[in-house]
Amino acid sequence: MISRNSILLRRLYPTTIIRTLATDATESTSVKTKRRRTIFTDELNKGPSFDDFVSGKAKDMLEDPLETARKDPNAKLPSWLKVPIPKGKSFHNVKKDVRELKLATVCEEAKCPNIGECWGGKKSEATATIMLLGDTCTRGCRFCSVKTNRKPAAPDPMEPENTAEAISRWGLGYVVLTTVDRDDLVDGGARHLAETVQKIKQKAPQILVEVLGGDFRGDLSMVEILADSGLDVYAHNLETVEALTPHIRDRRATYRQSLAVLERAKQTNSSLITKTSLMLGFGETDDQVLQTLRDLREIGCDVVTFGQYMRPTKRHMKVVEYIKPEKFDYWRDTALDMGFLYVASGPLVRSSYKAGEAFIENVLKKRKHNVGETPRLAQEIKPSIY
């Protein structure tokens, strides 16, 4: 059926004109579509190819959005959070070793802003925090960019050996091992971690080992296995204050459970240094942070670090506040006055940040040689962490 509008149009204009108008409209749409497709294709061609994804090179070609923000003078990221782009021979050597031995690092998986500094130092200073038990976590904390899955792949049985081999190559004096949570494993991965520590000590007994472990679903017998493995520093992160824990961490992680982990580690091996980390910028109050420090001192925690929460992607929690460097100085001084052995506090500090390793390494060496009491941080070293 011909519409009334069509009949009116034909009466007013000759057929040839209508056809011309229709042709022009079609051509115009075609040009716009072609232009859009051309722009899209051009942008696509700038990125990695299919072969790059297959070979694993694509990850190195894609730029981190956080890095883009640091280079953008109009970005909202405060100036004190901007760091140089990672580069240098040492950086690429560490990266090469990590790839060859098929190891995961929290430096890459968690998009740590200090990767250039930690990987790019001199051989005796360069370090990578190795992430054990794979690169996929069974939990989903709202601040973390590590991949999640209810049933990750089985742990690599060669991982302890490969990790020990990589660390012995780097010639380090101090190394940090961390892990994803593995709630799918009966022991939470505790025995795998303990084996890794033992392998490292066999290959290089002089290396001091810090392990940043999980809570093993509250099974403190697993904490005991790890604490007795030969490690030197037992770390487990509270992440935030008690009131915000249910909103920030996975529901299976609780504030009191984390305190119990740190307490049991110290009870199992009193010579261990126990360590935890807090992120600021979630909206916590000063009173809440102060109470957290009291709770940590009550269970004998030796070391605490403070860092700025930085949103990894738009899917994660928003930053409530960018804490100024002066406030981090305040928390460092406050924690030291409360009796903590060592405190690292600054916007870019992370739980495995290397600025603290020099001091902790010195403490452990003095303990092993029974050289009197170890002075506190303010008297020992003053690392630059900004």
UniProtKB/Swiss-Prot annotation:
GO molecular function, one term: 4 iron, 4 sulfur cluster binding
Binding site for [4Fe-4S] cluster 1: 107, 112, 118, 352
Keywords noted in UniProt: 4Fe-4S, Iron, Iron-sulfur, Metal-binding, Mitochondrion, S-adenosyl-L-methionine, Transferase, Transit peptide
Cofactor binding note from Swiss-Prot or TrEMBL: Binds 2 [4Fe-4S] clusters per subunit. One cluster is coordinated with 3 cysteines and an exchangeable S-adenosyl-L-methionine.
Record: transit peptide: 1-21
Keyword Magnesium found: no
GO BP terms, alphabetized: lipoate biosynthetic process
EC numbers, comma separated: 2.8.1.8
Binding, [4Fe-4S] cluster 2: 137, 141, 144
Pfam name, any one: LIAS_N
UniProt domain Radical SAM core: residue ranges: 122-341
Catalytic activity, as annotated: [[Fe-S] cluster scaffold protein carrying a second [4Fe-4S](2+) cluster] + N(6)-octanoyl-L-lysyl-[protein] + 2 oxidized [2Fe-2S]-[ferredoxin] + 2 S-adenosyl-L-methionine + 4 H(+) = [[Fe-S] cluster scaffold protein] + N(6)-[(R)-dihydrolipoyl]-L-lysyl-[protein] + 4 Fe(3+) + 2 hydrogen sulfide + 2 5'-deoxyadenosine + 2 L-methionine + 2 reduced [2Fe-2S]-[ferredoxin]
Annotated pathway: Protein modification; protein lipoylation via endogenous pathway; protein N(6)-(lipoyl)lysine from octanoyl-[acyl-carrier-protein]: step 2/2
Cofactor section: [4Fe-4S] cluster
GO CC aspect terms: mitochondrion
Keyword Transferase assigned: yes
NCBIfam families xrefs: lipA, PRK05481.1, PRK12928.1
Protein name as annotated: Lipoyl synthase, mitochondrial
